C-alpha cells in the first residue's frame, strides 16, 4: 500500500448515534509532518485514538504498516504531588529502558538536566520535553504528538517546533501533530489538515510574512512558525454539521463564508 505508515480511508465514528467523524481520508508517510488543526469538539482526539488503534471506526478502514512502532506524546499528564516519581523513574516505566537510554533520550530533547528531579517540580516546557523523550524511547517510525506545545509560551513553542523538525530529519519518522489552534502551526509542516468532524481542507501552511513586528520579535524563531489562512465554501451549524447554502438560508449561529481561498497545493477534503 505505497509508502504510507498509516492510511485512513473514509473513516467515520459515531457515539450514541451522533457522528463525530465522517469520511476522513488521511495518510502519513515516513519523514512527513502532518499537523491536524481544528476547534474543540472537532474530533481530533477521536482521530488520534483511531490512528493509535485504541478506537475502531464504525465506518471505513484504518491501515497500519505491519509491526509499525508508534511513539505517543499525550496532551496532558497529571501526577499526584505526593507520588515520589523522578523523571528517571518515569522514563524507566517504559519496558527495558535503562538509565543510560533515558539520559540519551533527554539529551536528544535538551532536557538532560532534569533527569533526577521530581517530575512534579519541572516546568511546563520541561515536562513537554520529557514526554517527547519518552515517545522517542520506543524508536518510533511514527510520532503522534497531541498538543505538544500546550502550556508553553510562544518563544518556547517555536523552540519545540524546531526540535520536532530536527527529530524528524534525524530519524526519518512520520509525525502526526495535533493542535486546537486554527492560526498557528509549524512552517516545517508538510501538510495541514483542518478538521471539524470531517476534513474541511488540507494543504501546505503559508509562511508568516504579513506582520513585521512578529518577525522582528522572534527573529529566527519566527521562521519556524506559520499561519494557515483559509476560508471554506461551506459553514458549520452549532452542532458542527455542514451547511451548504447562501447566507439567507442559514440557521442562527451559523457563519457563511462566500469565498474559498487556500494556500499553494491545497486540496479540499
UniProtKB/Swiss-Prot annotation:
Major subcellular location class: membrane
Top-level EC class: translocase
Pfam families listed in its UniProt record: ABC_tran (PF00005)
Disulfide bonds: none
GO molecular function: ABC-type zinc transporter activity; ATP binding; ATP hydrolysis activity; ATPase-coupled transmembrane transporter activity
Catalytic activity of the protein: Zn(2+)(out) + ATP(in) + H2O(in) = Zn(2+)(in) + ADP(in) + phosphate(in) + H(+)(in)
Binding site for ATP: 38-45
Keyword line: ATP-binding, Cell inner membrane, Cell membrane, Ion transport, Membrane, Nucleotide-binding, Translocase, Transport, Zinc, Zinc transport
Keyword Coiled coil appears in the UniProt entry: no
GO aspect biological process, one term: response to zinc ion
Family: Belongs to the ABC transporter superfamily. Zinc importer (TC 3.A.1.15.5) family.
Alphabetized NCBIfam families for the sequence: PRK09544.1
Quaternary structure note: The complex is composed of two ATP-binding proteins (ZnuC), two transmembrane proteins (ZnuB) and a solute-binding protein (ZnuA).
Known role: Part of the ABC transporter complex ZnuABC involved in zinc import. Responsible for energy coupling to the transport system.
Full protein name: Zinc import ATP-binding protein ZnuC
Species whose genome carries this gene: Pseudomonas aeruginosa (strain ATCC 15692 / DSM 22644 / CIP 104116 / JCM 14847 / LMG 12228 / 1C / PRS 101 / PAO1)
Phylogenetic lineage: Bacteria, Pseudomonadati, Pseudomonadota, Gammaproteobacteria, Pseudomonadales
Gene responsible for this protein: znuC
